[in-house]
């Protein structure tokens, strides 16, 4: 489910791919598409967003793990998140956010990922943008599909 203070709630579909190639980071690609009735010029299946990047897990000072996530978006934003891994939960907060002159005025994003009952991946993304306070923006529960 998606939405924001100035965006009517909407449903979307998503595919996330994590890929390992032997280096100390997982490649990451996410594609989302409109999954609601036609609205605001959007039709079911029309693309919404893509993000691509890498996830690196490093040993933490307290025996836990630190995760560093770099993401790039085609709408003019690049992000670096730093967070912690606790069991099957990953908490991420912005470390750096870079915007082009024409990108939306996003100033902060916080993400929570976790493996939930049945082995699904659930997440929530909160966003601070356009002068509005940090608030819920996206959340989903994804089922694992293997080739």
Swiss-Prot record:
Pathway named in the protein's UniProt entry: Nitrogen metabolism
Entry's cofactor comment: Binds 1 heme b group per subunit, that coordinates a highly solvent-exposed Fe(III) atom.
Catalytically driven reaction(s): peroxynitrite = nitrate
Record keywords, A-Z: Heme, Iron, Isomerase, Metal-binding
Matching InterPro entries: Calycin (IPR012674), Nitrobindin (IPR045165), THAP4-like_heme-bd (IPR014878)
Family statement: Belongs to the nitrobindin family.
Subunit structure: Homodimer.
Domains (record comment): Forms a 10-stranded antiparallel beta-barrel structure able to accommodate a hydrophobic ligand in its interior. In fact, this fold hosts the heme group, which is located in a wide surface cleft.
Protein's recorded name: Peroxynitrite isomerase
């Amino acid at each position: 489910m998606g939405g924001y203070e100035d965006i009517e709630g909407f449903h979307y579909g998503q595919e996330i791919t994590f890929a390992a190639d032997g280096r100390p980071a997982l490649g990451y690609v996410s594609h989302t598409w409109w999954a609601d009735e036609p609205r605001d010029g959007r039709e079911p299946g029309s693309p919404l967003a893509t993000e691509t990047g890498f996830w690196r897990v490093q040993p933490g000072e307290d025996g836990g793990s630190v995760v560093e996530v770099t993401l790039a978006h085609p709408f003019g934003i690049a992000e670096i998140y730093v967070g912690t891994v606790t069991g099957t939960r990953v908490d991420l907060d912005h470390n750096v956010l870079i915007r082009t002159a024409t990108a939306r005025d996003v100033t902060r994003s916080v993400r929570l990922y976790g493996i939930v009952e049945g082995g699904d991946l659930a997440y929530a993304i909160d966003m601070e943008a356009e002068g509005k306070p940090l608030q819920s923006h996206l959340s989903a529960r994804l089922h694992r599909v293997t080739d």
